């Protein structure tokens, strides 16, 4: 058969189109992980909690709801969740509500949270969650939840220890922390059954309660704000002012406990409370072996001469980087503090990408309704030679929804997601591995939730 020039060109065009279509259609789209988000059913506190779940698309990062979700969180006002034991179990901390029926809990009495609990879920291969059992902490107003790296122990930070209802200089707070201490927070420790995921209480082997029995919790200084595990040390960020609302902020100092991964025991370190020289600490994070404390108060950066990592000026917040020394003593990185970006406010969460090259700080902003221009994500490049140092990514800050509560990276290290409290959304961005930029996605990048989110986490197990 003979072809004219036009026929040949037409045939080649059809063939090329077929090849292109074939290649395009062979690009496999699959779920690379699951994104779970705790929150409330409606955009107000005090309502029943839920867990929403999404499948993360490997190619473009879009989110698709997991069949059967959302499900009840097992209580009111869920604030934290963790996965453990190979992502077979998920635990959700529900704060409960006060006598007024909302989640603004503090102290003891009518303002303290009632019916707080930890609800356990089994995680199915398709991401579905099935409720198992419910457990309870020893103190009041629980608000933080972590699991150790072995997956054998789970810890809950209670803002108020049981003895706070009747303060005394001879109570269990004083027995653990020293004479004259009348109030304290506490950590409740549970051992996780590796088969069933059931939690069992770990009692304090170091301190005997005033009634002669084993103490069922581990006291920490009053007004805790956050806590974090780093190796064999548990660090608790505490504040000076007694809070009159939630969330708890005003962190000023860090308290170390030595931690045993074989028994779950917390023992008093040789170091005492370490002041940080700040007054509005919001969070303490362990990322790639560095301890970061986020502080929501202005800092002035000066640049005497030469090249400085940050432009001189006054910034609305700061991040303090530390390494951990003997007994949990914090040692400041030689580079010193680094500022939050100038246009944002209220740093609340921090993420270091899986390659350890870039650091991102989610800023909640200061407006709870309407336009919130101070919400967004600050971005930094991490340098380790000749010494640890951070510098702003040129294209930062990056957009988010209004009032981000959490920031996570997907299991394939391609996408970053934030759950946003004030507009009840999830936002996603594509992570550029060469520049650290968080770019807009090729398709949808905002998903609407049923109500206000409080926390998010990613599961990389999809089978």
Report residues per predicted region.
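C-terminal motif of bacterial Sec signal peptides marking the signal peptidase cleavage site
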Residues: 21-25
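Classical Sec-dependent N-terminal signal peptides that target proteins to the secretory pathway
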Residues: 15-19
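Bacterial N-terminal signal peptides that target proteins for export
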Residues: 2-13
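Predominantly soluble domains enriched in secretory-pathway, periplasmic, or organellar proteins
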Residues: 26-463
